UniProtKB/Swiss-Prot annotation:
Pathway: Xenobiotic degradation; gamma-hexachlorocyclohexane degradation. This is Chlorohydroquinone/hydroquinone 1,2-dioxygenase. Binds 1 Fe(2+) ion. It comes from Sphingobium indicum (strain DSM 16413 / CCM 7287 / MTCC 6362 / UT26 / NBRC 101211 / UT26S). Keywords: Aromatic hydrocarbons catabolism, Detoxification, Dioxygenase, Iron, Metal-binding, Oxidoreductase, Plasmid, Repeat. GO terms for molecular function: dioxygenase activity; metal ion binding. It comes from the Bacteria.
């Protein structure tokens, strides 16, 4: 199979169907020290829900964890094969003991220190909805500048994403897609894990695959407790269009049209492994809020400004920071 030009640059954002907005704030902001950089609404379905964005100071690509708190919709998703199963953050070398103690103080059940691909890490789950997280020790060179959080000292703060892990039953077809269509390069194996990287790797440049032949497929619908999609960065709309054209030419035709998401432009493709990938062009978060005010107000489409208060009452999902 023909290998395409290297158009995908790295991890952009991860989007997760969670439980409650306050549960997300309690974990992402008050425990992990991220900034709530944007509060918007998601309008699909019978009732609106929040779409929340967490990251570093300006929500740079490679730091963005976005959530749909969907508990009120009453549908719980099933985690399983064909999904992102863990989101891993970078932490400075020597800080895992601090993070372990901090998580325990915050009533988060956390693992002992483990090692994979020669790197030490902790694993834990979102206390409110069960989605998987890891904190991995890595040199801070070339990593993202952390948000100056009142909850986490800057010297131990998380510095954007290290990697994401996809759980699959098999990897043959997904391996071909990632190498030939998504320009990921195999980096080696550790047990049932296969590592891939963009370019030479580094912060927000790594994707791991965990093979579990017995794991049942997870659900694709937007249900509480599962990662909905994994978004990857591309430089601009022309690169995005060329990527779609060429990947479809390889036979991977399950692509969406371009979607304007307010803060990025997106196309989606269902991969052979079942994981929903997105190619995302960054537009930024400061066109409707100043940098110092990011995340302070709920933002809605202009045509909905007149009914914003009514929508918020309908959601009935208050946030206290």
């Amino acid at each position: 199979m023909m290998q395409l030009p290297e158009r995908v640059e790295g991890l952009h954002h991860i989007t997760v169907a969670t439980g409650s907005a306050q549960g997300d704030v309690d974990l992402l902001v008050k425990t992990l020290g991220q900034r709530l950089v944007k509060k918007t609404m998601f309008y699909d379905g019978a009732r609106p829900v929040y779409h929340l964005y967490f990251g570093n100071e300006l929500g740079e690509p490679g730091t963005l964890y976005t959530t749909f708190p969907v508990r009120q919709a009453g549908y719980t998703g099933k985690r399983g094969a064909g999904q992102i199963s863990a989101v891993s953050y970078n932490a400075p070398v020597g800080t895992l003991s601090w993070w372990q103690e901090h998580l325990i103080k915050r009533a988060v059940t956390v693992s002992e220190v483990r090692e994979r691909f020669g790197q030490k890490y902790l694993s834990f789950e979102h206390p409110d909805c069960g989605v998987g997280f890891e904190i991995i020790e890595q040199d801070t060179d070339g990593q993202f500048e952390p948000w100056d959080s009142p909850y986490v000292p800057k010297e131990v703060a998380l510095r954007g994403f290290h990697s994401w892990t996809a759980t699959l039953n098999r990897n043959e077809e997904m391996d071909s897609f990632m190498r030939n269509a998504w320009n990921l390069k195999p980096q080696g194996r550790d047990g049932n894990y296969q590592r891939y990287a963009f370019g030479n790797g580094g912060a927000a440049k790594v994707l791991d695959v965990y093979i579990d032949e017995d794991e049942r497929p997870g659900t694709w619908a937007l249900g509480e407790g599962q990662v909905h999609h994994a978004a990857f960065e591309v430089a601009d709309l022309d690169v995005q269009a060329a990527l779609k054209f060429d990947v479809e030419g390889l036979g991977y035709t399950d692509f969406s049209d371009r979607k304007h998401r307010g803060y990025f432009e997106s196309i989606y493709v269902r991969t052979p492994g079942g994981v929903l990938f997105e190619a995302s062009v960054t537009l930024g978060f400061t066109h409707d809020e100043s940098p110092e005010k990011l995340g302070s107000e709920v933002k809605v489409a202009p045509q909905l400004e007149g009914v914003k208060d009514e929508l918020l009452r309908t959601m009935n999902d208050p946030i206290v920071i």
